[in-house]
Structures are given as C-alpha cells and as structure tokens.
C-alpha cells in the first residue's frame, strides 16, 4: 500500500486551529472510504506532555496503548474512527533522546551527529512508521512557521517529498487573514509573508486555508493565489463558526477533499457526511438547558479539561439539551463558600494531581451527596468522593489519601506499588519514583457488577477504559466503607483494584478511577456522560415542579 502524506503547517499567529482543520479534513477523507490517520509533531524539548502543567499546555490526552500525548490527538479521535497510538505524537525532546541513545551505543559508527541528517532522518522514520497501512496520513507540525524550534520538523517534511515522490505528498498551510474594521476588508499581506517564510525553507504550499472572522471575498482569494503561487481553488476560506463540527462541511463545500483526491489520483466515492449532519441537527434542536458545575484545579485554562468539556457537550446532544458548564475553582469553595454550587443540576469533579484544592472538592462531593444532586467523579473525583464518604458517613475522621497526607490515620487512597503493564510485565513504583512515565496509564479492562447503575448504562459486563493515575483505593479499609453504604460496581479483571463506586440510594452518584472522557465522540457520546446529563435534566425538571 502506498501512503499519501498531507503536511499541515501554520503561520502568522499560533492557536489558529491546525488540529481542528486537520481532523476535519481527515473526517471528510474517511467519509470517502479512505483509511486515514493523523499525527502531531510537537517542537518542545519535553519527552512528552505528561509532566507539563495543564495551565500551560492544556490536558494530556491518553491513548489506548498508554501514551501521554498532546490534546490535539483528542480532536483527532473525536473526528475520525482511527484510534491514536504512541506513534501519533512525538516531540523534539523524544527525537533528540532517541538520537543521543543511538550515539552512545555507537550506532552512527563514529560519525559527527548533526541535525541534518541524523535528527531529520529520525523524524522521517517515525512519520513513516505511524503512517504504515493507511491511504492518507496527515502530519500536523506544531508551532508557527518562523519559530526556531520547528525548523528540524520543517526540514524533515521538505525532504519527505523527495523520499515518497511529489505525487504522494501535499502541503497545507493554515494562515490568518485579519479583518480591519476601519478599512472594511481582510488583509492578505501577513499570509503572503508567511508563505514567503515557508518558501525560504524550501516548501511551496499546495493549499492555503485562510482563517478569518469574515468570509474571504473571491477577489481576495484570486490575489492570494497570485502572490502565493497556488491555484485559486486551493485557497480555502475558513471563517469563525459557532461549532467546530461544521468545519468538515465547510471544507467539503469548497472542494478541498476532491482537490486532494485528484492530486493523489485516488479513486474513491464522494464523502457521505450524513453522520456529521446528524450531529449538527442535534446541536440546533436542543429542547432545554442544564447547568453542570465542574469543580477543578486548573479552570484558568479550559483546555486543561478539553475532553471532559467536549464529552459533556456530546452527552447534551444525545439528550437534546444544551449543557451550560460552570467552571468552579475548588479553592474558592473554602474561601467564598458553597453558594457557587446552589442552583446546579449536577456536579462533576475531574482528574488532577497534588493537594491544592482537595478540601474544596471534598466540600463539593459532600454537597452533591447530601443534597441528592447528580454527581460524576473522574479519577481524582472518585478519590475525593471516597474520602468524603469515609469522613462523614463511615466515621473515619481525617480520612485521606497518602498523596495529600502520608501519615493519614485512615489512608483510604494509597499509592499503587505494582501492577501489570501493557507488555504483561510487573511495574513497580514508590514515592521516590520519577513523575514522568510512572503511572498506571492506558486502556484497562473493568468488570461491572450486574444490576449496578453503571452496568445498566454500559449494557455489558466488561468494559475497556483509559487510566492515568498513581493512587488507588485501599482495599484494607474498603470493607468498612462498603458497610456504611457505598457500593463498588466495577473492579479490575483480577478484582484487586476498585474502578467504579456508586451510592445506591442516591438519584445518581457515580465515580470512576478511569477517564471516560477520552473515548467520547460527537457521533456516539459516552454511556456515563449520557446517563449523567440525563440525570441532570431530571434534576432540573424536578426543581421546576
């Protein structure tokens, strides 16, 4: 199988939405019965984003095979059916680490190790590995053209055209057309300079996707085509929209997918975007609104909870309601009080690390339990729910996690010291282990208790969900908590690790150690989130009576 490559770069400014544009294009190509994958090349020196602050970088998206990756991979999985793997995201740091290890082993036979060819060859090798078995591979280059950090990646994709042949490679450049209100027009000069910067590296873009808050007029498209040396039909206007799920239709309406198929000489049926039209129909036909409070640690940057926010929106689509998400700083619940929780139809506590804000989260979990408000706890959200229940129902005053209090009298949550990893080997950890690459991470099977709420939602006895954590429920103390009324509705396949807890006599109180948000999509939703939003709607309707 010959793989065709589409390289996506960005210019003028950052945060233009290269990931969304690439994912939307991939969705159209997939709808044409092509086998498609996407990868993200990040120019930072970290080995992976696993230890980068969510306030700086946004969420860490976890793949099925346990890779901690860029949040753009979440967009990829929400737009296409292909599951991402550790091969779909790598960084400058990972490339340099690999090359330096080879140098130490003597793999380069005494050669002087340089950016060209050693670093660029390593980049190309990884791209080819990730693209194997696919008709089309989209490669998004992180950063902005002109950044010094991106140069090795840009040089590598320049070389790849020669390696794979011009008929199997295509460059898309995403750029900004600012609109000047005083002049009443979009300005093309920044785009011209961005393309000029690319040309200086040796890359001539084949397609320009022009981002703007206004539609790009036909005469401006002609001007861009002339000065940037691209065909007019390859100048795509992509103005701001109120829903990212409209973008596949916008790109298709301008013939981008057909242009690419013609370039690659791909004979395939026209795209059937019926499923995306259904998503848009559901968005436009919401019959109500529910307010869900998300009590977190990193609310300054909503991207820190990107997949959770999207999963709530997906569940809203399936319930035909608009989900109004209120981001609540956990620490403020201690300083300002619980007034921020009043009027909510449901409460969600997402994942996180460290002790900051924990007591505020415990207050939120207690409020949801005592006021019979639907509650969904994810990862840390399950742990704080368990701590709260132990303290206030099971009589374990000052119960805590050893992450927050190593000397807790009742350590209801403790460090996982060993478990079986994806290779079947026993992984061992301690408090002194490195932070990076030392978690129980990736897809794990979970056995559900028949008759439980979770079992009713999933409608199957065994599920597979993705994890990312170091701490687990302490099985030595668990029987006391269960005797007080808490139910364990999901365990690992060896029955050693608690995965899901419920409160049977509460309208809807579910908390899980895994991250269900990573497998939610706009076309399918996710059972837990759909059930959660449905319960929020029921709570809202009851409050109106």
Curated annotation (Swiss-Prot):
L-glutamine binds at residues 352, 380-383, 403, 470. CDD domains: CTPS_N, GATase1_CTP_Synthase. Residues 291-542 form the Glutamine amidotransferase type-1 domain. Mg(2+) binds at residues 72, 140. Pathway: Pyrimidine metabolism; CTP biosynthesis via de novo pathway; CTP from UDP: step 2/2. Signal peptide: none annotated. It catalyses: UTP + L-glutamine + ATP + H2O = CTP + L-glutamate + ADP + phosphate + 2 H(+); L-glutamine + H2O = L-glutamate + NH4(+); UTP + NH4(+) + ATP = CTP + ADP + phosphate + 2 H(+). ATP binds at residues 15-20, 72, 239-241. GO terms for molecular function: ATP binding; CTP synthase activity; glutaminase activity; identical protein binding; metal ion binding. Allosterically activated by GTP, when glutamine is the substrate; GTP has no effect on the reaction when ammonia is the substrate. The allosteric effector GTP functions by stabilizing the protein conformation that binds the tetrahedral intermediate(s) formed during glutamine hydrolysis. Inhibited by the product CTP, via allosteric rather than competitive inhibition. InterPro entries: Class_I_gatase-like (IPR029062), CTP_synthase (IPR004468), CTP_synthase_N (IPR017456), GATASE (IPR017926), GATase1_CTP_Synthase (IPR033828), P-loop_NTPase (IPR027417). GO terms for biological process: 'de novo' CTP biosynthetic process; pyrimidine nucleobase biosynthetic process. UTP binds at residues 14, 187-192, 223. The keyword Ligase applies. Residues 1-266 are annotated as: Amidoligase domain. Keywords: ATP-binding, Glutamine amidotransferase, Ligase, Magnesium, Metal-binding, Nucleotide-binding, Pyrimidine biosynthesis. Its EC number is 6.3.4.2. CTPSs have evolved a hybrid strategy for distinguishing between UTP and CTP. The overlapping regions of the product feedback inhibitory and substrate sites recognize a common feature in both compounds, the triphosphate moiety. To differentiate isosteric substrate and product pyrimidine rings, an additional pocket far from the expected kinase/ligase catalytic site, specifically recognizes the cytosine and ribose portions of the product inhibitor. Catalyzes the ATP-dependent amination of UTP to CTP with either L-glutamine or ammonia as the source of nitrogen. Regulates intracellular CTP levels through interactions with the four ribonucleotide triphosphates. Belongs to the CTP synthase family. This is CTP synthase. It comes from Hamiltonella defensa subsp. Acyrthosiphon pisum (strain 5AT).
């Amino acid at each position: 199988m010959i793989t065709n490559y589409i390289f996506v770069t960005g210019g003028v400014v950052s945060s233009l939405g290269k990931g969304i544009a690439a994912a939307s294009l991939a969705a159209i190509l997939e709808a044409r019965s092509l086998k498609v994958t996407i990868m993200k090349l990040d120019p930072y020196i970290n080995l992976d984003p696993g230890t980068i602050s969510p306030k700086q970088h946004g969420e860490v998206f976890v793949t099925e095979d346990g890779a901690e990756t860029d949040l753009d991979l979440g967009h990829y999985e929400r737009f296409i059916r292909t599951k991402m793997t550790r091969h779909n995201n790598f960084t400058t740091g990972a490339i340099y680490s690999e090359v330096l290890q080879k140098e130490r082993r003597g793999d380069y036979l005494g050669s002087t190790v340089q950016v060209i060819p050693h670093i660029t060859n390593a980049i190309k090798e990884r791209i080819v590995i990730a693209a194997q078995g696919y008709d089309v591979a989209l490669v998004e280059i992180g950063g902005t053209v002109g950044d010094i950090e991106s140069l090795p990646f840009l040089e590598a994709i320049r070389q790849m055209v020669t390696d794979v042949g011009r008929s199997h490679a295509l460059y898309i450049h995403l750029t900004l057309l600012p609109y000047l209100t005083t002049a009443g027009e979009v300005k093309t000069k920044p785009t011209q300079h961005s393309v000029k910067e690319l040309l200086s590296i040796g890359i001539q873009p084949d397609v320009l996707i022009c981002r703007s808050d206004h539609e790009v007029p036909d005469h401006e498209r002609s001007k861009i085509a002339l000065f940037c040396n691209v065909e007019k039909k390859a100048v795509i206007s992509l103005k701001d929209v109120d829903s990212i799920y409209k973008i596949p239709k916008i790109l298709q309406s301008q013939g981008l997918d057909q242009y690419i198929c013609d370039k690659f000489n791909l004979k395939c049926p026209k795209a059937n975007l019926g499923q995306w039209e259904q998503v848009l129909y559901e968005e436009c036909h919401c019959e109500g609104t529910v307010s869900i409070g998300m009590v977190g640690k990193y609310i300054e940057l909503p991207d820190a909870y990107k997949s959770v926010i999207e999963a709530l929106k997906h569940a809203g689509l399936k319930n035909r309601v608009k989900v109004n998400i209120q981001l609540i700083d956990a620490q403020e619940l201690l300083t300002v009080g619980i007034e921020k929780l009043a009027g909510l139809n449901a409460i969600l506590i997402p994942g996180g690390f460290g002790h900051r804000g924990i007591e505020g989260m415990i207050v939120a979990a207690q409020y949801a339990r005592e006021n019979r408000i639907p509650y969904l706890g994810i990862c840390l959200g399950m742990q704080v729910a368990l701590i709260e229940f132990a303290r206030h129902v099971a009589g374990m005053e000052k119960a805590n996690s050893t992450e927050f209090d190593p000397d807790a009298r009742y350590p209801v949550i403790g460090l996982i010291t060993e478990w079986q990893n994806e290779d079947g080997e026993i992984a061992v950890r301690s408090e002194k282990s490195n932070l990076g690459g030392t978690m129980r991470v990736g897809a794990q099977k979970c056995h559900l208790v028949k008759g439980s709420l979770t079992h009713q939602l999933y409608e199957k006895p065994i599920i597979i969900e993705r994890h990312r954590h170091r701490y687990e429920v302490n099985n030595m103390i668990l029987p006391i908590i269960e005797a007080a009324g808490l139910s364990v509705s999901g365990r690992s396949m060896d029955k050693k690790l608690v995965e899901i807890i419920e409160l049977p006599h509460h309208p809807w109180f579910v908390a899980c150690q895994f991250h269900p948000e990573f497998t939610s999509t706009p076309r399918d939703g996710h059972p837990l989130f759909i059930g959660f939003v449905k319960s929020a709607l029921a709570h809202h309707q009851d409050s109106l009576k």
